[in-house]
Amino acid sequence: MRHGFLVAGLAAALMLTSCGGKDDVQGKTGEDITAKSSASDIGEAYINEMTRIADALETVDDEASAKAAAKKIQVAVDGLNQMSEELDGEISGVKGMQIFGGRYAELVQVQGRIATSMIRIQSDHPELMDTISAEMDRMEN
């Protein structure tokens, strides 16, 4: 049941956080974001970090891949959390529309990928959820 809440919480958590290394990401990441960053840069970084999470989750099918995915998720969650702290954790409705308005389709797509992967892992490999959840639970709302 806790994992069901995790999936729901993840969708709700999509109101901002982000950072991490650029090792596997093209464009902005959470480490690039400051309080002075443009809405466009914030949106790009957020979607890039969430894409990193989605990509990692899609690889999970055994204990080794779950551990590898958890390391990638850790980097993305660190980035999301750093971005949230840099932006004081609050984005007004207007600012949120500026950030995600033009990228709404991308945002919905990456959220769907994450939710689908979490459901698949929970259904097919419930024993791997603790490994994944340990990192996902660190995401600040």
Model-assigned labels for residue ranges:
Residues 76-141:
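Compact alpha-helical subdomains of small soluble proteins
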Residues 23-74, 138-141:
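Immediate post-signal-peptide N-terminus of mature secreted/exported proteins
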Residues 1, 21-22:
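Intrinsically disordered, low-complexity peptide-like regions
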Residues 7-13:
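Classic N-terminal secretory signal peptides
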